[in-house]
Amino acid sequence: MLFRSKVAVIGAGSWGLTFGKILADGGASVVMWARRPELAAEITESKRNSRYLSGINLPRTMTATTSLAEALDGAQQVYLSIPSQALRENLAAVKPLVDRTDAPIVSLMKGVEKSSGLRMSQVIEQVLLCDPARIAVASGPNLALEIAREQPTAAVISSLSPETAEAVARRSRNRYFRSFVNTDVIGTEFGGVLKNLIAVDRKSTRLNSSHTD
């Protein structure tokens, strides 16, 4: 029987689900943490998520739970896909469950914490009190639904530790998703922030243009 390493994805929104699919298609056994029981049940039983990824079939190696302890138990890598302004409070619940492990902690989030101005990797380091070499960030020109439909794309995995970055990149590679590594965590995170700002600006420009036609 093929052994699949377990990874946990904390947050079952569109990007968390999409990255969970990437990981499962790359050979991992993926356990999602979802806040709502009905969402966890749909992912586990129907292999669907009609709210965030309508029409997408999820891999059979993806399941979901509302229990953080169950999701994190035995996870060899932990991926965080939580709204950036809610990260700190959610990490407080995660901390006691990852304190005794050395599993890499991977941020899938873009943005900075408004109250402190800290980047997501800095919030993770501050709350979890973990070695920054254990933290990685993932970023790229990615749209969740396009990737969920398996349109070929790529991302960058950054960590102060090349070993951590490469371990995460290996886990997240599959036939339609390629991951490249670097150690420029700051540049990778701010690149993701700027990408979001440009996307919002372009959307606003299109809306204003349509109103003047």
Per-range role (PLM):
Residues 7, 29-30, 133-135, 179:
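Hydrophobic anchor at the start of a short beta-strand
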Residues 54-63, 101, 131-134, 175-177:
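A short helix-to-beta-strand connector/capping loop
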Residues 86, 97, 123, 127-131, ...:
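Internal alpha-helical scaffold of NAD(P)-dependent oxidoreductase catalytic cores
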